[in-house]
Amino acid sequence: MTIINYLVTITFFILLGLFYFLLGTALLKDNEKLETTKVVIGFIFHTFLMAIVGIIFQVFKLQWMFYLIFTILWTICCLIYSLFILKTYKVKLFNQGIKDFINKYWFFVILLIIFSVSIFCNAGRMWADNLTDDGYYLVRIANLPYMNNTFSADATTGFKISGINSYTLNTWELEASVYLFISHVLPTVFIRFGMSIFNFFLIICGLHSVIGKINSYYEFDKGVSSFQYYCFIIVPILYAMTILSRSTLGLDLE
């Protein structure tokens, strides 16, 4: 059963990544743009409206089920738009072919494996609910779809809350609750494993895109396929953050 949860989670996030890539390709309509740039643009475009609508839902304490319906309709609209643009303007997903695509991004797989191994090496704390604050987000994401008074109660205690606080402007748990509800897998696997790796993937996509943009101005490297290797810098940075937090603050950032 646990294996199925992992397989469903992996499949879901692969499809989500492909959706962002498809949407970003349609929005840019430019075959010369880096594929990572297309993923980032697709992610920002899709998530931005969901965040705006999500804030409205949380401020006015609307029912979660209506947000689920909105998310599904918005995603379908983005998908239809993407397919229409790709067909109408004859935009190619892989301008130089799939072989060139693999050559430009194969190192991403290595980076994702390194990050995944790091996660499992920290599995003890990960499955022990980590820090209290992290546990709050887990419980909130898991409980939002099943609460009658979705935004009028504290997801961890069930006590009634009133007014507007900083969490009202934070919609990532709301969006994640929709994805978790659709995938129907264990919250810990989906969030700690799936979302952690997928967010890392988005980070290296953004880093790769920035490197490509800088190179377009300064031309420090002629080969696009070598941009992926510069992304390795994120690995020692993350480890340095962890070591620094342990030695100076006594915290264990994961």
Label for each model-derived stretch:
Residues 19-24, 142-143, 254:
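Specific aromatic-rich, kink-prone transmembrane helix
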Residues 1-102:
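Membrane-embedded, hydrophobic transmembrane alpha-helices
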Residues 114-253:
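Active-site lumenal/periplasmic loops and adjacent helix-entry segments of GT-C-fold
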Residues 13-16, 67-69, 108-115, 146:
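Low-complexity, intrinsically disordered or weakly predicted helical/coil tracts enriched
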Residues 100-120:
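Internal/C-terminal transmembrane anchor helices
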Residues 42, 65-72, 105-109, 193, ...:
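Alpha-helical transmembrane segments of integral membrane proteins
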